[in-house]
Protein backbone atom coordinates (compact mmCIF):
# COMPACT_ATOMS: atom_id res chain seq x y z
CA UNK A 1 0.00 0.00 0.00
CA UNK A 2 1.29 3.44 -0.92
CA UNK A 3 1.92 5.89 1.93
CA UNK A 4 0.01 9.15 2.21
CA UNK A 5 3.33 10.96 1.70
CA UNK A 6 3.97 9.14 -1.59
CA UNK A 7 0.34 9.62 -2.57
CA UNK A 8 0.65 13.37 -2.08
CA UNK A 9 3.87 13.32 -4.07
CA UNK A 10 2.01 12.12 -7.17
CA UNK A 11 0.37 15.53 -7.33
CA UNK A 12 3.78 17.19 -7.37
CA UNK A 13 5.05 15.17 -10.34
CA UNK A 14 1.78 15.65 -12.18
CA UNK A 15 0.72 12.03 -12.52
CA UNK A 16 -1.46 9.70 -10.43
CA UNK A 17 -0.51 6.05 -10.79
CA UNK A 18 -2.99 3.31 -11.57
CA UNK A 19 -0.45 0.90 -10.06
CA UNK A 20 1.20 2.79 -7.16
CA UNK A 21 3.66 -0.07 -6.60
CA UNK A 22 5.54 1.14 -9.68
CA UNK A 23 6.14 4.50 -8.02
CA UNK A 24 7.28 2.81 -4.80
CA UNK A 25 9.73 0.67 -6.76
CA UNK A 26 11.03 3.74 -8.61
CA UNK A 27 11.72 5.44 -5.28
CA UNK A 28 13.49 2.46 -3.68
CA UNK A 29 17.29 2.50 -3.99
CA UNK A 30 19.08 -0.84 -4.23
CA UNK A 31 20.51 -0.28 -0.74
CA UNK A 32 16.98 -0.61 0.66
CA UNK A 33 16.29 -4.11 -0.64
CA UNK A 34 14.03 -5.38 -3.38
CA UNK A 35 12.21 -4.62 -5.55
CA UNK A 36 14.53 -1.67 -6.16
CA UNK A 37 14.70 0.83 -9.02
CA UNK A 38 17.69 -0.36 -11.09
CA UNK A 39 15.64 -2.08 -13.81
CA UNK A 40 13.34 0.92 -14.03
CA UNK A 41 16.38 3.18 -14.24
CA UNK A 42 17.64 1.12 -17.21
CA UNK A 43 14.35 1.53 -19.05
CA UNK A 44 13.91 5.17 -18.06
CA UNK A 45 17.30 6.07 -19.49
CA UNK A 46 16.11 4.99 -22.94
CA UNK A 47 12.68 6.58 -22.57
CA UNK A 48 14.02 10.00 -21.55
CA UNK A 49 16.59 9.94 -24.35
CA UNK A 50 13.80 9.23 -26.84
CA UNK A 51 11.53 11.96 -25.47
CA UNK A 52 14.27 14.59 -25.49
CA UNK A 53 15.56 13.55 -28.92
CA UNK A 54 12.03 13.80 -30.29
CA UNK A 55 11.45 17.21 -28.69
CA UNK A 56 14.72 18.61 -30.07
CA UNK A 57 14.06 17.14 -33.52
CA UNK A 58 10.70 18.92 -33.65
CA UNK A 59 11.85 22.23 -32.15
CA UNK A 60 15.10 22.58 -34.11
CA UNK A 61 14.23 21.65 -37.73
CA UNK A 62 17.50 23.07 -39.09
CA UNK A 63 19.92 21.76 -36.47
CA UNK A 64 22.42 19.16 -37.62
CA UNK A 65 23.06 15.82 -35.92
CA UNK A 66 25.98 17.14 -33.89
CA UNK A 67 23.97 20.01 -32.43
CA UNK A 68 21.05 17.73 -31.61
CA UNK A 69 23.35 15.19 -29.95
CA UNK A 70 25.10 17.82 -27.84
CA UNK A 71 21.78 19.31 -26.77
CA UNK A 72 20.38 15.95 -25.76
CA UNK A 73 23.54 15.13 -23.81
CA UNK A 74 23.27 18.46 -21.98
CA UNK A 75 19.63 17.87 -21.04
CA UNK A 76 19.90 14.26 -19.87
CA UNK A 77 23.30 14.36 -18.15
CA UNK A 78 23.49 13.43 -14.50
CA UNK A 79 23.63 16.96 -13.11
CA UNK A 80 20.66 18.07 -15.24
CA UNK A 81 18.50 15.17 -14.07
CA UNK A 82 19.59 15.73 -10.48
CA UNK A 83 18.53 19.37 -10.79
CA UNK A 84 15.07 18.24 -11.91
CA UNK A 85 14.94 15.86 -8.95
CA UNK A 86 15.71 18.71 -6.55
CA UNK A 87 13.06 20.93 -8.13
CA UNK A 88 10.53 18.14 -7.55
CA UNK A 89 11.92 17.45 -4.04
CA UNK A 90 12.44 13.86 -5.10
CA UNK A 91 15.25 13.26 -2.63
CA UNK A 92 12.82 13.56 0.27
CA UNK A 93 10.77 10.67 -1.14
CA UNK A 94 13.60 8.19 -1.74
CA UNK A 95 13.69 4.92 0.17
CA UNK A 96 17.33 4.32 1.12
CA UNK A 97 19.21 1.75 3.16
CA UNK A 98 20.71 2.84 6.50
CA UNK A 99 24.20 3.36 5.04
CA UNK A 100 23.04 5.54 2.14
CA UNK A 101 20.69 7.45 4.41
CA UNK A 102 23.49 8.19 6.86
CA UNK A 103 25.88 9.30 4.10
CA UNK A 104 23.34 11.71 2.59
CA UNK A 105 22.45 9.61 -0.44
CA UNK A 106 19.21 11.55 -0.92
CA UNK A 107 21.37 14.54 -1.92
CA UNK A 108 23.80 12.70 -4.23
CA UNK A 109 23.52 13.59 -7.92
CA UNK A 110 23.92 10.01 -9.14
CA UNK A 111 21.14 8.66 -6.91
CA UNK A 112 18.81 11.56 -7.74
CA UNK A 113 19.40 11.24 -11.49
CA UNK A 114 18.82 7.49 -11.39
CA UNK A 115 15.58 8.03 -9.48
CA UNK A 116 14.30 10.51 -12.08
CA UNK A 117 14.92 7.94 -14.82
CA UNK A 118 13.18 5.28 -12.73
CA UNK A 119 10.12 7.48 -12.16
CA UNK A 120 9.95 8.21 -15.90
CA UNK A 121 10.00 4.47 -16.62
CA UNK A 122 7.32 3.88 -13.99
CA UNK A 123 5.02 6.42 -15.66
CA UNK A 124 5.72 4.86 -19.06
CA UNK A 125 4.85 1.36 -17.81
CA UNK A 126 1.80 2.54 -15.88
CA UNK A 127 0.37 4.44 -18.85
CA UNK A 128 1.93 4.74 -22.31
CA UNK A 129 4.51 6.78 -24.21
CA UNK A 130 2.08 9.59 -25.09
CA UNK A 131 1.10 10.09 -21.45
CA UNK A 132 4.72 9.88 -20.38
CA UNK A 133 5.61 12.57 -22.92
CA UNK A 134 2.84 14.86 -21.64
CA UNK A 135 3.91 14.46 -18.02
CA UNK A 136 7.69 14.45 -18.38
CA UNK A 137 8.54 17.09 -20.99
CA UNK A 138 7.34 19.98 -18.78
CA UNK A 139 10.05 18.95 -16.28
CA UNK A 140 12.63 19.84 -18.94
CA UNK A 141 10.92 22.95 -20.33
CA UNK A 142 13.08 25.51 -18.53
CA UNK A 143 16.28 23.78 -19.65
CA UNK A 144 14.96 23.29 -23.19
CA UNK A 145 14.04 26.95 -23.50
CA UNK A 146 17.42 28.07 -22.13
CA UNK A 147 19.40 26.21 -24.80
CA UNK A 148 20.62 28.40 -27.69
CA UNK A 149 18.63 27.16 -30.69
CA UNK A 150 20.73 24.80 -32.76
CA UNK A 151 23.89 25.66 -30.86
CA UNK A 152 23.83 24.06 -27.41
CA UNK A 153 26.76 24.73 -25.15
CA UNK A 154 29.61 22.26 -25.52
CA UNK A 155 30.44 20.01 -22.61
CA UNK A 156 32.92 21.35 -19.99
CA UNK A 157 35.87 19.18 -21.10
CA UNK A 158 35.54 20.38 -24.70
CA UNK A 159 35.17 24.01 -23.65
CA UNK A 160 38.20 23.84 -21.36
CA UNK A 161 40.31 22.13 -24.01
CA UNK A 162 39.40 24.70 -26.66
CA UNK A 163 40.12 27.57 -24.25
CA UNK A 164 43.61 26.19 -23.55
CA UNK A 165 44.34 25.40 -27.20
CA UNK A 166 43.42 28.95 -28.21
CA UNK A 167 46.22 30.15 -25.93
CA UNK A 168 48.61 27.38 -27.01
CA UNK A 169 48.77 25.97 -23.51
CA UNK A 170 49.06 22.33 -22.49
CA UNK A 171 45.90 20.26 -22.28
CA UNK A 172 44.50 19.43 -18.84
CA UNK A 173 45.64 16.28 -17.09
CA UNK A 174 42.90 14.18 -15.51
CA UNK A 175 43.80 11.71 -12.78
CA UNK A 176 41.65 9.29 -10.82
CA UNK A 177 41.82 10.02 -7.09
CA UNK A 178 39.58 7.18 -5.97
CA UNK A 179 36.61 5.06 -6.89
CA UNK A 180 34.22 3.36 -4.52
CA UNK A 181 31.00 1.39 -4.45
CA UNK A 182 29.84 -1.87 -5.98
CA UNK A 183 29.38 -2.32 -9.76
CA UNK A 184 25.88 -0.80 -9.64
CA UNK A 185 26.68 2.22 -7.45
CA UNK A 186 30.16 3.30 -8.49
CA UNK A 187 31.41 6.70 -7.37
CA UNK A 188 34.49 8.40 -8.80
CA UNK A 189 36.60 11.38 -7.77
CA UNK A 190 38.95 12.84 -10.40
CA UNK A 191 41.41 15.74 -10.43
CA UNK A 192 41.96 18.17 -13.30
CA UNK A 193 45.36 19.91 -13.41
CA UNK A 194 46.30 22.87 -15.61
CA UNK A 195 50.09 23.01 -15.51
CA UNK A 196 50.83 26.53 -16.75
CA UNK A 197 48.13 28.02 -14.55
CA UNK A 198 49.05 26.00 -11.46
CA UNK A 199 45.37 25.21 -11.10
CA UNK A 200 43.94 21.96 -9.77
CA UNK A 201 40.28 21.13 -9.33
CA UNK A 202 38.37 18.00 -8.42
CA UNK A 203 35.11 16.51 -9.62
CA UNK A 204 32.81 13.64 -8.73
CA UNK A 205 30.37 11.45 -10.62
CA UNK A 206 28.91 7.99 -11.11
CA UNK A 207 31.42 7.33 -13.91
CA UNK A 208 34.95 8.49 -14.55
CA UNK A 209 33.74 10.46 -17.58
CA UNK A 210 31.17 12.35 -15.51
CA UNK A 211 33.73 13.03 -12.79
CA UNK A 212 36.13 14.47 -15.39
CA UNK A 213 33.34 16.69 -16.76
CA UNK A 214 32.62 17.90 -13.23
CA UNK A 215 36.30 18.66 -12.59
CA UNK A 216 36.55 20.53 -15.91
CA UNK A 217 33.44 22.53 -15.02
CA UNK A 218 35.03 23.58 -11.71
CA UNK A 219 38.20 24.59 -13.58
CA UNK A 220 36.15 26.78 -15.94
CA UNK A 221 34.43 28.39 -12.94
CA UNK A 222 37.85 29.17 -11.42
CA UNK A 223 39.10 30.68 -14.68
CA UNK A 224 35.95 32.79 -15.01
CA UNK A 225 36.27 34.09 -11.45
CA UNK A 226 39.88 35.14 -12.11
CA UNK A 227 39.02 37.25 -15.15
From Swiss-Prot:
It is found in: Cytoplasm. Its EC number is 3.1.26.3. Residues 155-225 form the DRBM domain. Digests double-stranded RNA. Involved in the processing of primary rRNA transcript to yield the immediate precursors to the large and small rRNAs (23S and 16S). Processes some mRNAs, and tRNAs when they are encoded in the rRNA operon. Processes pre-crRNA and tracrRNA of type II CRISPR loci if present in the organism. This is Ribonuclease 3. Belongs to the ribonuclease III family. One of its GO terms (molecular function) is ribonuclease III activity. Keywords: Cytoplasm, Endonuclease, Hydrolase, Magnesium, Metal-binding, mRNA processing, Nuclease, RNA-binding, rRNA processing, rRNA-binding, tRNA processing. Mg(2+) binds at residues 41, 114, 117. Residues 203-227 are annotated as: Disordered. GO terms for cellular component: cytoplasm. InterPro entries: dsRBD_dom (IPR014720), RNase_III (IPR011907), RNase_III_dom (IPR000999), RNase_III_sf (IPR036389). Residues 203-212 have a biased composition (Basic and acidic residues). PROSITE patterns: DS_RBD, RNASE_3_1, RNASE_3_2. It catalyses: Endonucleolytic cleavage to 5'-phosphomonoester. It comes from Xylella fastidiosa (strain 9a5c).
